[in-house]
């Protein structure tokens, strides 16, 4: 079997992958909080539950290849935390029973800037409105 078709396929896919617009999620709350403080940015906290199809769907549909992704990356420090990893983030501050939940936080005061978005309310339209 020739490697030539695979080579051309990879060359064709590379620009698509490089042009994909996605949120630069961090996976550690403490690191994200320190970065947000240092850069004077807001903290965007997405709490997900492992093996939750709605969480995966929302990440794919609302946080990939959207016009507002650059705005999120420039104005905020986004972090994903898992409910099951409760020791890795202040669960008492981000307590929720609905997954996923999206919190908008003033990093210096550790206060919520608005009501969180829960589950299916995390839509492209809602996120776009918040960034205007």
Model region roles, listed by residue range:
Residues 1-10:
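Bacterial N-terminal signal peptides that target proteins for export
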Residues 50-53, 62, 83-87, 97-98, ...:
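Solvent-exposed loop/turn segments at secondary-structure junctions
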Residues 23-27, 48-49, 68-87:
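Thiol-based oxidoreductase modules, predominantly thioredoxin-like and allied folds used
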């Amino acid at each position: 079997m020739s490697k030539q078709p695979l080579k051309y396929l990879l060359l064709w896919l590379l620009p698509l992958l490089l042009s994909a617009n996605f949120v630069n999620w961090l996976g550690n709350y403490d690191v994200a909080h320190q970065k947000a403080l240092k850069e004077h940015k807001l903290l965007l906290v997405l709490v997900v539950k492992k093996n939750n199809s709605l969480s995966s769907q929302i990440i794919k549909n609302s946080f990939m290849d959207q016009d507002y992704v650059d705005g999120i990356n420039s104005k905020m420090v986004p972090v994903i935390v898992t409910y099951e990893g409760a020791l890795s983030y202040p669960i008492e501050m981000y307590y929720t029973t609905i997954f996923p939940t999206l919190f908008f936080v003033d990093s210096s005061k550790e206060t919520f800037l608005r009501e969180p978005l829960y589950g299916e309310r995390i839509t492209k339209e809602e996120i776009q409105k918040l960034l205007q």
